[in-house]
Amino acid sequence: MAHHDPIGLIAPNAGLAQLNERSRDIFRQIVESYLATGEPVGSRNISRLIAVPLSPASVRNVMSDLEQLGLIYAPHTSAGRLPTELGLRFFVDALMQVGDLTEPERQSIQSQLASVGKAQSVEAALEEALTRLSGLTRTAAVVLTAKSNVRLKHIEFVRLEPDKALVVLVAEDGQVENRVLTLPSGVPASALTEASNFLNARIRGRTLAEARLELETALAQSKAELDQLTQKIVAAGIASWSGGDSDDRQLIVRGHANLLEDLHAMEDLERVRLLFDDLETKREVIDLLGRAERADGVRIFIGSENKLFSLSGSSTIIAPYSDGAGHIVGVLGVIGPTRLNYARVIPMVDYAARIVSQMLGR
């Protein structure tokens, strides 16, 4: 069963803990009706759904109490009620039963990733994981991966101009990264070759982060072996790998079109337009997903609990994934309307993250 952590953004309310079974049952029916249809539900329908028979008038009294607690509200167009963000958070943390995936759902995620993982790069496998997750959950799926965790295979310096060279980094999974490097004046071809040999002897099988540490130590110990120009090239090559913050993080989004399904009104269309705008603000999305790297298990952000998606009224369900050494190297998950099927989506995100971790550990 998937584990998820309440994020503690909403102050505990003593009244919530004191809800009796009848109030919880009515509240659960309001939320489940909303998650299924997106429409407000009235007291007459609720009285037909609950386990213990109650008149619509009695249901209305309970709904009034729930409204005072801030768990539900009445939209201006309807006599029915909808859950608030606080209500959804209370439902997810206290009332919802998170189930296990069906065997076909597990197989769908696992088999697709297994076939890609054998033949292609990690990036291709992550994209396939997103496509599969997006299709199963009918949401936009996202992954944030740290490039510094890619394992290196080879480095080469290619002279472009007298004072410029291309640094070509080849990873074990086939990814190629190019950086332009400014050379010290008067660098002979032999210095570029010597720098390449020095680096290649020490980087194979290491991540960028590991390689930087190893090479900084090795460079300090090997200065007597290398002439000054070669030392400068090696040092410049190491520095070029650091890049900017955005270079060290890669954001992939799949399944935008799923967000256009099941729109109920013009305000739904406006909400999705705002969400598309939010997804374009790459830096903020990266910052949000980065928060999950410090979490144990699935994280859930509902509506305004997360500033980025507050205007579009969206929910985010994300989980970290690890490499073979157990180090967290990225985050994957889904973004969609607050009307997500949380009980179904949470275990899917959790399972996809675990399968990606297994794949990276092979």
Swiss-Prot record:
<keyword id="KW-0805">Transcription regulation</keyword>
<dbReference type="Pfam" id="PF01628">
    <property type="entry name" value="HrcA"/>
</dbReference>
<dbReference type="GO" id="GO:0003677">
    <property type="term" value="F:DNA binding"/>
</dbReference>
<dbReference type="InterPro" id="IPR029016">
    <property type="entry name" value="GAF-like_dom_sf"/>
</dbReference>
<dbReference type="InterPro" id="IPR002571">
    <property type="entry name" value="HrcA"/>
</dbReference>
<comment type="similarity">
    <text>Belongs to the HrcA family.</text>
</comment>
<keyword id="KW-0678">Repressor</keyword>
<protein>
    <recommendedName>
        <fullName>Heat-inducible transcription repressor HrcA</fullName>
    </recommendedName>
</protein>
<dbReference type="InterPro" id="IPR036388">
    <property type="entry name" value="WH-like_DNA-bd_sf"/>
</dbReference>
<dbReference type="InterPro" id="IPR021153">
    <property type="entry name" value="HrcA_C"/>
</dbReference>
<dbReference type="GO" id="GO:0045892">
    <property type="term" value="P:negative regulation of DNA-templated transcription"/>
</dbReference>
<dbReference type="InterPro" id="IPR036390">
    <property type="entry name" value="WH_DNA-bd_sf"/>
</dbReference>
<keyword id="KW-0346">Stress response</keyword>
<dbReference type="InterPro" id="IPR023120">
    <property type="entry name" value="WHTH_transcript_rep_HrcA_IDD"/>
</dbReference>
<comment type="function">
    <text>Negative regulator of class I heat shock genes (grpE-dnaK-dnaJ and groELS operons). Prevents heat-shock induction of these operons.</text>
</comment>
<keyword id="KW-0804">Transcription</keyword>
